[in-house]
A protein has these predicted regions:
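Alpha-helical coupling/stalk and coiled-coil linker elements that connect catalytic or binding modules
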Residues: 4-11, 18-25, 40-228
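Long, low-complexity repetitive segments of secreted extracellular proteins
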Residues: 10, 16-17, 30-34
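Extended, EK/Q-rich alpha-helical coiled-coil segments that serve as long dimerization/scaffolding arms
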Residues: 32-42
Length: 229
């Protein structure tokens, strides 16, 4: 995301410079040094939503895996919600809810009835009164979700490696552009400060003499200064 942000700044500065009217300036070479990569920037920005969030559309494979995960999770929840509402099963539960333990969907079974709900125990409450059981009916589906999650992580890693390779391929011009952008940023900051302070470039004489006319220290608030005419 930081790389995409830098590439976006290269493009914004290039657009701003190209749309402004000005004579030739000593800073022109800095703007000419910028090398925007709008295609790569757009790919990164649309794929990586946040440091820990990859868009479904980052790749066809990732999109398909997430659809499978979503469909399987819905199927599991539907089956478990039907189970917890069932009168024959609900009497063995502490409450009629579906929760997660160790990445698997479970139901809270009263410890004295742990043998009445067939499945795998994944956790026990701090009081020991509740065991969290993964019902046998959804064990296989839960296992599929874990498999899909592992494949999802592998696909995300592949996408990141591919982006890294693309950025590495433009590393020399990226570094050059980045340094130019920093220099431009410093110059713009100086220009803004000069405008805020109503400062101007002094005229330098060749005889080593100088006159300070209405001069003031730039770090002292102008409102605190009384300058006699």
């Amino acid at each position: 995301l930081m790389v995409a942000g830098a590439l976006r700044n290269f493009q914004n500065l290039t657009n701003w410079y190209g749309s402004s009217e000005h004579d030739m300036l000593p800073t022109d070479d800095l703007f000419y040094a910028l090398s925007p990569e709008p295609g790569l920037e757009q790919q990164i920005s649309s794929a990586i939503l946040a440091p820990d969030a990859m868009a479904d559309t980052a790749s066809r494979t990732l999109n398909e895996l997430r659809k499978k995960i979503h469909a399987t999770e819905n199927s599991i929840r539907d089956r478990l919600e039907t189970m917890v509402r069932n009168m024959d099963t609900s009497k063995y539960l502490q409450e009629s809810v579906v929760s997660m333990r160790n990445g698997r969907y479970v139901v809270p079974v009263k410890s004295e009835y742990r043998g009445e709900v067939s499945g795998i125990i994944h956790d026990v409450s701090s009081t020991g009164a509740t065991v969290f059981v993964e019902p046998q009916a959804v064990v296989e589906a839960n296992a599929r979700i874990l498999q899909y999650r592992a494949q999802e992580a592998q696909e995300i890693e592949r996408i990141l490696v591919a982006f890294t390779a693309q950025v590495a391929a433009i590393e020399p011009q990226f570094q050059y552009s980045y340094k130019a952008m920093l220099e431009i940023d410093v110059l713009l900051a100086k220009a803004r400060l000069a405008l805020d302070m109503k400062a101007f470039k002094p005229a330098v004489r060749t005889d080593s003499s100088f006159s300070l006319i209405r001069a003031r220290h730039p770090l002292i608030d102008l409102s605190l200064i009384h300058i006699s005419e």
